[in-house]
Amino acid sequence: MRFTKMHGLGNDYIYFDLVSYPISSVDWRELAVRLSNRHTGIGGDGIVLIMPSEACDFRMRIFNADGSEAEMCGNASRCIGKYVYERGLTRKTIIALETGAGVKRLHLQVNNGVVETVCVEMGKAIVNEGLRMKDIRLNSSDSESAAWRPHLLETSETKVISPSSFILPPLSVVDMGNPHAVVMVDGEITDEMVWQSGPRIEKDPRFPHGTNVEFVRVENRQELRMRVWERGSGETMACGTGACASAVASYAKGLTDNEVTVHLLGGDLHISIDEHWQVRMTGGATIVFDGEVEVPLVADPR
């Protein structure tokens, strides 16, 4: 089966084009675990399926390196925009993409047939009062009102009994179609912070489906620095939805402007937030190589 390795700022996935090469009898969860292994597989943060859609131009499914399915990935969305245009699946420069978090519109900046950047309409950010991903709207009964402002959850030093004794740092819970816990850091974002705090917050029982965890330092009103522990994949070079969540949390706190550049390990993303808390993300995407891999067929695909 043919695949294409791509990355968005180092957030790398193995992409399968099921529009050009349709196949259904595959255990995608098992395949994601096997192929994502960087020693015995192709290596990546997971696999992404580019699929036909009845309602949109294309559909995206994402499986993390541990086999779990994710609702949305901003970096993968940009990569799909580049792939479908440069491989001739569409001539559109505005693409409707069906995801597990709803329809996302991709705006392609094309120069001489090459997609240089992709701007993704990420949708409306929700900053929650509690850890149950409940949509809380303040000062307005109309969810689209410009008067609505997200409410931030600020945990005090809360003792977490399970899975181990750990002091949960102050965080903000943001829904970008997938869950995010944003930790604002005053000083250096350390390896210990990411690799010890990240998995513990990810698996905290108050996040029943787990969460992505962002560690964020405000550089100035137009810049953030971020490292991310992704649910199901561990630390990655970049996370598009995480960059959006970080920008929303810092803007809602009054720490930054509504347009920021987020510096990640793999590069920079530009995030903008409008008066209705609709978020846009702009960045590049890279095709690394194409290949073929043997894929076992199963009677009961997942």
PLM features per residue range, with description:
Residues 3-5, 170-174:
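Short, flexible, solvent-exposed loop/turn segments with mixed acidic/basic and small polar residues
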Residues 132-136, 140-163, 169-172, 181-206, ...:
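Anionic-ligand binding region
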Residues 83-86, 127-128, 137, 145-146:
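Amphipathic repeat-derived elements
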